[in-house]
Swiss-Prot record:
It is found in: Cell inner membrane. GO terms for cellular component: plasma membrane. This is Multidrug resistance protein MdtH. Gene3D superfamilies: MFS general substrate transporter like domains. Signal peptide: none annotated. The keyword Metal-binding does not apply. The chain crosses the membrane at residues 13-33, 99-116, 139-159, 165-185, 214-234, 244-264, 277-297, 300-320, 340-360, 368-388. It comes from the Bacteria. NCBIfam families: PRK11646.1 (NF008650). The gene is mdtH. The lineage of its organism: Bacteria, Pseudomonadati, Pseudomonadota, Gammaproteobacteria, Enterobacterales.
Amino acid sequence: MSRVSQARNLGKYFLLIDNMLVVLGFFVVFPLISIRFVDQMGWAAVMVGIALGLRQFIQQGLGIFGGAIADRFGAKPMIVTGMLMRAAGFATMGIAHEPWLLWFSCFLSGLGGTLFDPPRSALVVKLIRPEQRGRFFSLLMMQDSAGAVIGALLGSWLLQYDFRLVCAMGAILFIVCAIFNAWLLPAWKLSTVRTPVREGMRRVISDKRFVTYVLTLAGYYMLAVQVMLMLPIMVNDVAGSPAAVKWMYAIEACLSLTLLYPIARWSEKRFRLEHRLMAGLLIMSLSMIPIGLAGNLQQLFTLICAFYIGSVIAEPARETLSASLTDARARGSYMGFSRLGLAIGGAIGYIGGGWLFDMGKTLAQPELPWMMLGIIGFITFLALGWQFSHKRTPRQYTGARRLI
């Protein structure tokens, strides 16, 4: 086996271990934020939505800067620094008793993500061969689902005792992950050339096709982020107990572990990437509309199942399609900018979703936020259809990236 092949094989295992630590650290804390501050402390959902939206916007909106700096200086220092910063954000969140302190903790967490997320995604592009990336993304997403359930279960158990224990566990996991990267991650360069920060950013911004695609995905992310805000609140309201939230993530894990990889393998040679993305988005949009009318857990979990199935279809295609549009000379910059749709959609989804949820309760119309999200999904579906009908995209891809 050549040294390059050996490095790629070892790199796969490194990426999988690193990803599991990050997923566990994230899902121990974030799914429980809305339960802690809305249900237990009685805050308005919009206040928590602002915090979650701020984290999302900082991490994803500034991702192009983190990616461009990583193109210049390499992945390792950015990843280690970012993970330690997220640990500090979680530690601060544990003592948050005022909205401004929660917002500050989410700001720190998001800034840490800005530093470590783009170079981690660029490492996938560097280490995984183009023909293998679609399947590797499916493995990562299956791992995400399993990690989400384990993290949510652990966080829910710790929440029975003290929310500070939840945040401490999340911080410890990110510190362990920082040590893991500092110890084992080689000083790899991300791009084929050591691209200056400004040059990498210029390459991305001048790529109109990539920019249009990324911005269009904002509508997709408005739906996707509700897994962290409105869906847990809805499950808690219907069930009358925050313990039911873990079953929501268990459903996601079961569907992902059983369907994600087989669907990706079966569809990659039969359907174009854009058709898979649009089909998944359509299912997600249709499942959103009736959620506000669900009167029991059986109805609610059925709709959540449909939503997750749509996500299982769409996510690998979205990742792979994003990868096909990258430039190898500025991988970090592309990976960073590709997060802008998530930054915009996530911020609007969290803040707007929280506001609509509160408004729906005030007006005694709980279906209001879900109807609006369904409409946004349909608009995004049409926008993607128009874009893809004018610009052909490849069935496979050449180049890649990833909500945490």
